[in-house]
Amino acid sequence: MARRPRHSIYSSDEDDEDIEMCDHDYDGLLPKSGKRHLGKTRWTREEDEKLKKLVEQNGTDDWKVIANYLPNRTDVQCQHRWQKVLNPELIKGPWTKEEDQRVIELVQKYGPKRWSVIAKHLKGRIGKQCRERWHNHLNPEVKKTSWTEEEDRIIYQAHKRLGNRWAEIAKLLPGRTDNAIKNHWNSTMRRKVEQEGYLQEPSKASQTPVATSFQKNNHLMGFGHASPPSQLSPSGQSSVNSEYPYYHIAEAQNISSHVPYPVALHVNIVNVPQPAAAAIQRHYNDEDPEKEKRIKELELLLMSTENELKGQQALPTQNHTCSYPGWHSTSIVDQTRPHGDSAPVSCLGEHHATPSLPADPGSLPEESASPARCMIVHQGTILDNVKNLLEFAETLQFIDSFLNTSSNHESSGLDAPTLPSTPLIGHKLTPCRDQTVKTQKENSIFRTPAIKRSILESSPRTPTPFKHALAAQEIKYGPLKMLPQTPSHAVEDLQDVIKQESDESGIVAEFQESGPPLLKKIKQEVESPTEKSGNFFCSNHWAENSLSTQLFSQASPVADAPNILTSSVLMTPVSEDEDNVLKAFTVPKNRPLVGPLQPCSGAWEPASCGKTEDQMTASGPARKYVNAFSARTLVM
């Protein structure tokens, strides 16, 4: 019997007919002398031709005689080479429907292992062909549906760990053959994984805290790598050495009707081989497609509760929380703490008893001492309790809040608590209703005084539009400078400005001579239609003053010209020194507004005024066309 090839692609190893069956395997190593190398080299073309001639001469009854003519070949090798490769009666083409139906009937009669017996009933077929046909196509348990993402993920994870051991990978995917898995990997998955990053895990830096905690704690489908040896120290605390925290949650029993949310979690710790983890999860998913989602929700719920409980210190055994019936004793040991600091976190039992771990590590249950363990939620219990998953989450938050409230209540009763010199890091607490007395809150040392709204509104607040205007002003002209708002300081500043301007430009104030009549005239022209204002600006007032004075009256009150003094610096009452104030609004003589008019040249006037021949030729018909229509009102 030849030995099975090392990298076989077939999952069934119960048949003894597995030998090298290639028609053209002549490029192998040459046979060597000695029994040590028998059967370990491929058949050459010369050996095959010689075997055919020997079979034609001697027949197929005595293979030992034929093997004598072939050195380094046994009678079994010669027989198998002829029956499985060189026999011209072998059928190597596609299978017919009659052959498939015959294989199904023979498998039902003899079972899926006796392939040599089955092959005798099929002319031209050998046992290996029948076995491959059954396992890859005819087996009713073989899935022929499209590959799912979950199956791809299992194949990807298993291939990273096992390599091309397709038979081992096929055990994780019932319903999929090793040949189908191999073809799926080579044809589709390898390219998608290597080139497109399919199913690639995110980097450790981008992982969320929930994902990191899940990888470390291995709640539902994770496996530890070392058993948790636990023993009780003389002080009564358990010392645990392990990489992962160990949890032993017993089944909930005798749930009382007083519990506001009657939820019973049956969590068992069972021994499961590590390669079969994905198969277990798939087994649950086949029965109920929605169960995977529910398991993940419950897993995240347990994980969040465990993270909150790990941050709290161990509470006394006799506590208010132990009086709640219906919660079974639960021992949660955090192994991430150093030695001597690990203790049960909380007690949720009926008889105020804190469960303890066995003193002898060997006395632990078999499932707790197993190096490969996982926490699996009982199948039947999940279906009954998933409806109350939200109530269970609220119950856990209520219990956690009650633990925090009861632990803080003892320290709040002290009259003069001592404040630590170094601030302590507070634990994250679940929000709950504060039941502290109002007087106690007001007298609390750590209480921040409430800021009343009347205090906040004592100072004026700048409206939003002014804020935007000031911000734009600062961007354009730079930061604003605060000036004193008293009248005396304003007058002094104005005097300095007037003196500086008079020194530079020689300002001459003639406002007193034609002040009041001129201001009245301006007001009349502003309130009058446009025609009057046009006549005013063409009057002799501008020529008499030579544009040297600003048109303001020295005796007119602020009410007559409300839009003149709008600046905060200039909003001051009229002082005695009016002449100096009026000088600030004069216009220097050496700044002419309009230059002297110059007559147009003879060549420029026709071109600019449209008097050239071409322009007159074009504008003449246009005028005639426009004049033909009467004037009409434009309706918008």
Swiss-Prot record:
Domain of life, per the record?
Eukaryota
Q: Where is this region: Disordered?
A: 337-368
List Phosphothreonine occurrences by residue.
Answer: T530
Residues annotated as region Transcriptional activation domain?
A: 275-327
Q: Where is this cross-link: Glycyl lysine isopeptide (Lys-Gly) (interchain with G-Cter in SUMO1)?
A: K499, K523
InterPro entries given for it? C-myb_C (IPR015395), Homeodomain-like_sf (IPR009057), Myb_dom (IPR017930), MYB_TF (IPR050560), SANT/Myb (IPR001005), Tscrpt_reg_Wos2-domain (IPR012642)
Leucine-zipper: region residues: 375-396
Q: What is known of its domains?
A: Comprised of 3 domains; an N-terminal DNA-binding domain, a centrally located transcriptional activation domain and a C-terminal domain involved in transcriptional repression.
Q: What is this protein called?
A: Transcriptional activator Myb
This protein's species is Mus musculus
Q: What is the lineage of its organism?
A: Eukaryota, Metazoa, Chordata, Craniata, Vertebrata
Question: What is the name of the gene encoding this protein?
Answer: Myb
